[in-house]
Amino acid sequence: MATADRDLTFYTHSLCPYAHRVSLCLAEKAIPHKREHIDLSNKPRWYLDLNRRGLVPAIQLDGEVKTESLELNYFLDDVFDGAARLTPDGRKEEMQTVIDSFDGSFISAGLQFVGGGWGFRRGAPGPRQVDRMAEECEKIERIIEINGNGGPYLMGSEVTLADLALWPFAERYELAMREFQGVELREMGPTGSLSRWIDAMRSRPSVVGLRPDDNKLLASWRRTMRLDYFDYETADVDNP
């Protein structure tokens, strides 16, 4: 396990959900690091030289650059001591299977529900989009009941990397679905486990500290009608 004196730089965009995953991991584990905000609408040359694809998140540890949000969180939890261990003892493969089960499908279902791709539509989505999102919410509830033994978190009574992988997207979809479709994400889970999970996550200091201002975020979404508008114009958590 690494000690706190290693040179860690985190390259992020404060509104990117993938980078948000790593921000949560760093906060939960209280890992000291330097944070560099990257303007994705105008990527600096030095960053492209460092990270050829120019994407976030990325970290540089002792001169070595690593990318991909899930892989970064696995790496950070394995390598760094911290305030928390985010992989349950003896259940790493089970946790990875849980993450794999929702990583693509929940993200895709949510994007289609709020507008198809990364854009927004106003008004009700079609029956296919509703059914698909409902299936994903029911899947999350089954994970909580089976893998989490009732929760409140996905893997049980303690937060894990699985929760940090799902939360940035759930948080954005909850706000977008309420604003643009008049639908409450938490009500799409029939047993109430999804709602309790949302409440448990919202109570965590890391989540509270990294949450953007809803009113500012909604204003930016209404202006651009895109979840990923920050890829095209300068924005950050303080001025979305």
Q: What do these predicted regions represent?
A:
Residues 21, 97, 101, 139, ...:
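Alpha-helical scaffold segments in carbohydrate-active enzymes
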Residues 188-219:
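A contiguous, mid-protein "functional segment" used to position or interact
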Residues 89-90, 124-131, 178-196:
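Short alpha-helical "patches" and their helix-cap loops
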Residues 43, 183, 215-219:
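Short amphipathic alpha-helical segments embedded in low-complexity Lys/Glu-rich regions
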Residues 156-181, 187-193:
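GST superfamily/GST-like fold recognition
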Residues 151, 174-180, 207-210:
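Substrate-binding/catalytic groove segments of enzymes
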